[in-house]
Amino acid sequence: YIFDTGPLFKFLATDCVPQLISAIGGSTVVVPEAVDFEIHDTPNRRPQFRHARDVWKKFPPRFRDVIPDSPSKELRRCCNQVFGIDLETLYRHKKDLGENMMLLHGLSRAHAGEKVVLICDDQGGIAKTKEQIRVLRHRQHLGTCPTEGSLSYAETTSLLHWAIEVGSFKSQEHFIKKYNMMAELDEALPKKVKDTGLTKRPPWPPVDH
């Protein structure tokens, strides 16, 4: 699971680290260096994320992996494939750098045969990811890259769905309170939790009679 900044901010800012880790089955939260930088830098301009930065500093080390964005042959190749520019030029475009490096690292690992899930809320980032999923499958069909590798994506609502399924929220009221806090942070989530389908059964268990 490789994360963009937005979804991570929502869980950090609302003290939902246990729910985040439960949602991904105890896997490691992987972030590119550019995302780690954004977690530390964005709160300087957007104070609603200051608490997220503090929580990230205390994030359990065994569940966190900040991966270097230093140039590699595969990252360079992926950058040229996805964006049509060299890596050094991409580095100079600070806007969306975290999101872009998330995609490049994910694609690089998928080419190496790993099963990768990218966590992103930005619609532009999702569109780019969908396009690269199609390209990867086409290359696998042609036999030009390992067939065992895969690339997929999930959004904050997907993570919340998974967290509900594994019983990570104490109650539906607890979930709704946290959701409303997340929705106030930015524009990525619907303001009304009812619009997400996340208060239905499933993902909540059936009512006992």
Name the predicted role of every residue range.
Residues 1-116, 123-209:
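Active-site-proximal, substrate-binding regions of enzyme catalytic domains
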